[in-house]
Every structure is written in structure tokens, then in C-alpha cells.
């Protein structure tokens, strides 16, 4: 990846966006994006050196929160809190397009996402991790493409995550004492309500292994941005296909779920630290993900205005 110098001032434009907060920085070498929740972000912040927050303007509005850029060891990372400060954004309100566009604008070519899920399988136990390899998208209120209104773009999604980065995560998990499932199908629902029992049983019948609300359209937009994307699912509980113990009160169930989520977050942090400390290649310009738009634009290029081409030029880098 080439070195990009970004001057964060209100006067200096960078691909029609502005960065603010902090002094000038140079994005040296590889910058790995991480998208996750507040717990993971707080833990990473304690380990980052030379950390700065960056506000990034995009054609799709502001991302969920300022992006925290810094270093862990020899790796530079850019962390984005998906739900915003204080977990204020419901899944349907997350500005997924702005989040992915902002990451790409900063020079991120690889993103590792993380997020809480419910388990649809007895063998996937709360507190464990899953490196997701497939999705079933049930969302219906979210913008799932950057190209609305001026171009038709059909990206391949048969293999919806980067197998190369996913394998790096799987290999790293073998080095540490963290139970990590090497594959799993994630059913992404709109929310914010949880499933009915009938829906949960249906999702199991479809072949789903996990149920969550945040992976889509994040993975689709990452593919449109030509970003290598992998996802670590943090299992917080069993979904309602599996009845809870009749004598358990709601408060104790919630405490149990939060404890499971904290355990999974700690495991995810350990896995990410292992990956960042390793020598495996996280960013590769030769990866097929980096060429996902090569044959995807079906609209006659002459019919796309210069302004629209300039607006989304970042996606083609």
C-alpha cells in the first residue's frame, strides 16, 4: 500500500471529505481496519500507541463515530465503534455506507469486523467465537450499495468474506486457548426486536448457525469498496429456539448474557492481538477482493457523470 499523507483541517479536502482532530499524520504502510463494539474499542484504546481520533466526511454522511487510528506493536490499526459512543445507534440506524467509505478513505484495504450474535446450534456455546464464512441477509431498511441512482453494479457475493484474512484468523486461534469455530452461517435480521421462536426455528431450518443484526450490509459494502473483509462473531447466548430454564428470572438471564458477551469480547481481543503480533499477511493487493469492481460495473461508463466518478473514486483505489 502506498503512503498517504492526510492533513486534517477544515480547509484541506481529501477526496471531497475532511478530517479533523489532532495534528497532521502520515499513514505509513498497512492500515488494518477493525469495526466492533464499545467494549472492544475501549480495550484496544488502552493498547494503542500514538492514538488519534479522526472525523471523516463522506458522500454518505458521517460514520458512526470518529475513527481511532494508532499502533499496536508494528501494526497500524483504524478502529470504528459501529454503534457510536454510548451504543446510541440501533442496528437499522448504523450508517454502514459512511462507515465503510470512511475506512477506505483513510487507506484501509482490510477490515476485521466483530459483533455479538445468538447461537442457533447446540455446539456453538456462548462465550465462544466464530469466524463467519456465509450470510443470509434478511435486512430490508438499509442502503446496501454505494451506487444508487447513477450506476448498476453487480458484485459477486458467492464467497462473501475474504477467505485469506479469515484463514489468518483461524490459524491464529489455534495458537491460543480460545474456542473458535472456523466457519458458520450468519443470519442477519433487521431488528431491533429479537426473533420469535417460530422465526428462530426457521433460521435453524435454513441452515443458519448464528443470528445477529449488524453484519449486513457491512460485508456487501466492503466488497463494493474492494476491501478484504472478515468477521469474528461473539456468541452471547442461545437464541430462543432453545428454551431458557423456567425458573430463571429476566435479570439473571441478562446478567448471564452480559457475562458471556464480556468473555467473548475478551477472547476476541486476545485473537486480534495474536493476529496483529503475527507475521501473516493481512493486507494484500493481489487478493481477489481488491479487484471486486473490475467486471462489476454494468452501466456504460459514458453515462456516468464526472462528478459521480469523482465522488466515488475512493472505492476504485
Feature locations, PLM:
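Zn-dependent metallopeptidase/amidohydrolase metal-coordination segment
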Residues: 213-254
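A short, charged, Gly/Pro-tolerant segment at domain boundaries
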Residues: 284-317
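Generic non-transmembrane alpha-helical segments
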Residues: 164, 168-179, 270-278
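Active-site/ligand-binding-proximal alpha/beta "capping" segment
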Residues: 176-209, 298
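Non-catalytic positions within long, well-ordered alpha-helices that form the structural scaffold/packing
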Residues: 104-107, 204, 223
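Metabolite-binding pocket within alpha/beta catalytic cores that recognizes anionic/polar moieties
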Residues: 25-158
Amino acid at each position: 500500500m502506498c503512503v498517504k499523507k492526510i492533513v486534517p483541517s477544515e480547509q484541506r479536502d481529501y477526496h471531497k471529505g475532511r478530517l479533523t482532530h489532532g495534528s497532521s499524520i502520515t499513514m505509513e504502510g498497512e492500515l488494518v481496519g477493525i469495526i466492533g463494539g464499545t467494549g472492544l474499542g475501549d480495550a484496544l484504546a488502552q493498547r494503542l500507541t500514538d492514538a488519534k481520533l479522526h472525523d471523516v466526511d463522506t458522500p454518505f454522511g458521517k460514520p458512526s463515530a470518529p475513527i481511532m487510528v494508532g499502533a499496536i506493536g508494528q501494526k497500524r490499526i483504524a478502529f470504528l465503534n459501529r454503534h457510536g459512543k454510548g451504543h446510541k445507534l440501533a442496528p437499522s440506524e448504523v450508517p454502514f455506507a459512511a462507515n465503510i467509505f470512511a475506512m477506505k478513505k483513510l487507506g484501509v484495504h482490510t477490515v476485521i469486523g466483530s459483533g455479538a450474535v445468538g447461537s442457533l446450534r447446540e455446539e456453538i456455546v456462548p462465550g465462544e467465537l466464530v469466524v463467519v464464512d456465509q450470510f443470509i441477509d434478511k435486512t430490508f431498511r438499509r442502503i446496501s450499495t454505494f451506487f444508487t441512482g447513477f450506476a448498476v453494479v453487480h458484485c459477486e457475493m458467492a464467497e462473501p468474506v475474504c477467505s485469506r484474512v479469515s484463514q489468518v484468523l483461524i490459524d491464529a486461534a489455534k495458537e491460543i486457548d480460545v474456542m473458535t469455530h472456523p466457519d458458520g452461517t450468519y443470519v442477519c435480521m433487521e431488528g431491533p426486536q429479537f426473533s420469535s421462536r417460530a422465526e428462530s426455528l426457521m433460521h435453524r431450518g435454513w441452515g443458519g448457525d448464528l443470528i445477529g443484526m449488524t453484519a449486513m450490509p457491512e460485508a456487501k459494502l466492503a466488497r463494493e469498496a474492494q476491501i478484504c473483509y472478515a468477521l469474528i462473531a461473539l456468541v452471547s447466548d442461545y437464541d430462543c429456539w432453545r428454551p431458557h430454564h423456567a425458573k430463571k428470572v429476566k435479570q439473571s438471564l441478562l446478567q448471564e448474557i452480559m457475562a458471556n458477551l464480556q468473555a467473548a469480547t475478551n477472547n476476541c481481543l486476545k485473537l486480534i492481538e495474536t493476529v496483529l503480533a503475527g507475521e501473516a499477511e493481512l493486507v494484500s493487493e493481489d487478493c481477489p477482493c481488491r479487484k471486486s469492481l473490475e467486471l462489476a460495473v454494468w452501466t456504460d461508463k459514458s453515462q456516468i457523470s464526472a462528478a459521480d466518478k469523482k465522488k466515488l473514486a475512493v472505492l476504485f483505489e
